[in-house]
């Protein structure tokens, strides 16, 4: 059984730090420190949500477009998908790898869309970065502050020619890629790679049908 959307959405309901201001020049993006990028992005997305009445009201199409255009470009989906699929990734054909990336991305887009629709008055505390000069992979550790206990939210990031990109996310001690790897392995063992693709496609189709439903007045 794949990760329950409701449970994961509950975990990442404050995972808004992934947002990106796409007007940022490429040169600045490539020079920006990873912890500063997370801090800036968190402020950007909070400002966007507070200013956009459609997002606040739960307009699913608007939220999905927001996530797809502003968040996902800062995620290394090739690495994330390959890691989630595990050893079976190398056995997959190029076409299967392409489909896996597409369906996995769609799944995460809708998951984050559900998370962003729940953002209210949270703030983020970015902890001091523990890294050496020249490091190309780091973990940026943060806390989400709101009602109740602080929520641990950490990012695994890698330095690329286009700046720092996220390839894994830790919420309350649970790494996203590791969680999906376990579930994907079970699906592949039972139904093969094509079976995993079909399962992801079905979940995304069902999610799209739900999103297309009538809006409440």
Language-model features, listed with the residues they occupy:
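Solvent-exposed loop/turn segments at secondary-structure junctions
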Residues: 106-107, 131-132, 172-176
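Bacterial N-terminal signal peptides
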Residues: 13-23
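Surface-exposed, charged secondary-structure patches
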Residues: 110-151, 203-217
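Sec/Tat signal peptide C-region and signal peptidase I cleavage site
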Residues: 23-30
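N-terminal export leaders
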Residues: 5-13
């Amino acid at each position: 059984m794949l990760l329950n959307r409701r449970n994961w959405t509950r975990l990442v309901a404050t995972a808004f730090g992934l947002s990106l201001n796409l007007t940022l020049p490429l040169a600045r993006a490539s020079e920006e420190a990873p912890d500063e990028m997370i801090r800036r992005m968190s402020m950007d997305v909070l400002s966007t949500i507070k200013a956009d009445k459609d997002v606040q009201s739960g307009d699913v199409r608007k939220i999905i477009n927001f996530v797809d255009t502003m968040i996902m470009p800062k995620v290394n989906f090739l690495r994330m998908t390959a890691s989630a699929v595990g050893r079976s990734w190398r056995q997959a054909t190029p076409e299967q790898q392409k489909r896996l990336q597409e369906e996995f991305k769609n799944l995460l887009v809708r998951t984050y869309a559900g998370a962003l629709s729940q953002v209210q008055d949270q703030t983020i505390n970015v902890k001091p970065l523990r890294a050496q000069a020249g490091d190309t992979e780091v973990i940026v550790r943060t806390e989400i502050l709101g009602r109740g206990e602080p929520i641990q939210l950490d990012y695994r990031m890698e330095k690329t020619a286009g700046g720092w990109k996220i390839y894994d996310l830790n919420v309350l001690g649970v790494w996203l890629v590791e969680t999906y790897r376990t579930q994907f392995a079970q699906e592949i063992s039972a139904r093969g790679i094509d079976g995993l693709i079909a399962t992801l496609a079905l979940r995304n189709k069902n999610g799209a049908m739900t999103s297309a439903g009538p809006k409440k007045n």
